[in-house]
Amino acid sequence: MKLDWERTGRRMGFIDLSKYEVWSYDTECTGLQYKVDKVFGFSIATPDGQSGYFDVREQPESLQWLAEQVEPYKGTIVCHNASFDYRMSLHSGIKLPLSQIDDTGIRACCINEHESTIFPWTRGRAGDYSLDYLAKKYVGAQKYAEIYDELAALFGGKATRKTQMPNLYRAPSGLVRKYACPDAELTLELWLEQEELIKKRGLERIVAFERKVMPTLIRTEARGVRVDLDYAEQAIFKMDGVVRENQAKMFALAGREFNPNSPKQVREVFGAKEEGGVWKSRDGTILERTATGNPCLDADALRSMTDPLAAAVLELRSNIKTKDTFLAKHVVEHSVGGRVYPNINQMKGEDGGTGTGRLSYTGPALQQIPSRNKRIAAIIKPAFLPEEGQLWLDSDMASFEVRIFAHLVAAYNPAIAKAYAENPELDLHQWVGDLMGIPRNASYSGQPNAKQMNLGMIFNRGDGAVADSLGMPWEWCEFTDKKGELIRYKKAGREAKSIIAAYHSQIQGVKTLATRAQKIAEERGWIQTAHGRRLRFPNGYKSYKASGILIQATAADENKENWLRIEDALGSDGSMILNTHDSYSMSVDENWKPIWERVKKAVERQTLRVPLLLEFDGVGKNWAEAKGLIDVH
């Protein structure tokens, strides 16, 4: 929706904003780091075509006016990247009412989770979730493009965003106004256009749900996570020793020294050879081709190998990243006042996130802290602390994605729901194994086992990938699809096909779910979760993944529902610290048992076809103690 911004000259005064049902807000800051940088100016736009830039450097009283406007406000305050604007405003003394905030970036992902997806027909081009791109696409307008040239003329350097945006706070208010006012205007125009699209496409439920979740996540971001910086320095020293051990082991397995980050040297040590048009590593693993025709030896390829050298390379890379990027950079270097302030990606956006709605962390990426490698976890996790005078309580959702899978399959197979009703602690892998007469876990490569069968179905890996995970024979095949794209896939051998057929015969509903989801994705172009989240398949692209994506998106929705319930159950007795994988870490009062009981009861709701279980991990003075981890160093 286009509004006439020129007639007011973009010179809004200290007006009464309470008369508007909606207005937009955008901040200009001295930098991007919360608790370090501050707001030096802000812009506001209203639906009657008024907009204005308020320069705090020249009008410090503008902050007081803004505080008086937002405190009692009952309408909608629209931002693009609301978390950033909220936190930077908070550090500058302005507490925006979180219940009144909306975010055009999050709404954009609800409308289309593929803005930044590259499809075969887009020829390598994709959009993004920036205000500039979305405004161009949906309202036919763009940000003030000359700002970088004007800043370069004033301060020197290249006329690029990266070079010039750090200079914005040094620019005169008249120049900042030319940049800032259009940002607020475009944000409001985009929001108004989104309102029409949301109603037209029936997206009200998921948009309302994400808006409800937003305050909980922003509060957690603003609180940050306490860290023990003295211990973090010790952890870096400990990780140095681990990395040296890893390196020595890797060189011994390779029989030579090499650079694990050099594609050429990695190809050489794994003895990649082309046989009959197929690339193979020295352990016989079939490798995909890169665009240049070379063998692909990325992390996925290394994980698929039986060669112990592959695991050694992955371990070394992971531990170097943990030491240098995570501990040294994000924890020690970027902590402020003994806390780190990671960003929680609520949806896919400018800085990461997922189209399924699954949460992730950046700066630092807390979900990347090793959990299965107990040795590394025991070194890293003591650095993370609960709030002063409280304890760290850790909990885990029991087989969370497996239960979501069971919930969806139970719509076509009531026996699964019945089995869970009779035993809420049911192990689905064991249940499937008993039905099929196969073990839960494999005792040797190539042995059919229920766990890998189930995981293959949950993530919709395809028969060939299931065969590969079971250690059974498979081969690469390829075909050209209707659009002329060459598709390569893993084709299962006879033995794997037989066990997969037996699985579908015994475990009714799994194939029905996959077939039905794929059919709807192809015919309608999208499928939908119970919360109303759309998962789109343009031109039916990769519709065979529909059921797996539905499982992931449903799990993401239920995880966000858990956040709401946990925050409500904690009340004033604690707070959420972080959520990694299927775990919830909380800071709680020392009298933690009744608090835990409230949280457990809130999460274990009876709204799905199978029960959800939240299991207690432990409590302690830091994350490691709560997990029962012991540092052997």
UniProtKB/Swiss-Prot annotation:
Superkingdom field: Viruses
A single GO molecular function term of this UniProt record: 3'-5' exonuclease activity
UniProt keyword Nucleotidyltransferase, yes or no: yes
Catalytic activity: DNA(n) + a 2'-deoxyribonucleoside 5'-triphosphate = DNA(n+1) + diphosphate; dZTP + DNA(n) = DNA(n)-Z + diphosphate
Keywords carried by this UniProt record: DNA replication, DNA-directed DNA polymerase, Nucleotidyltransferase, Transferase, Viral DNA replication
GO biological process: DNA-templated DNA replication; double-strand break repair; viral DNA genome replication
Family named by the database record: Belongs to the DNA polymerase type-A family. DpoZ subfamily.
Record-linked NCBIfam families: phage_DpoZ_1
PANTHER family in the cross-refs: DNA POLYMERASE I, DNA POLYMERASE NU
Function: DNA polymerase that preferentially incorporates the non-canonical base aminoadenine/dZTP instead of adenine into the synthesized DNA. More efficient in using dZTP instead of dATP as a substrate. In addition to this preference for dZTP, the phage also encodes a dATP triphosphohydrolase that removes dATP and its precursor dADP from the nucleotide pool of the host.
Record protein name field: DNA polymerase DpoZ
Lineage, highest ranks first: Viruses, Duplodnaviria, Heunggongvirae, Uroviricota, Caudoviricetes
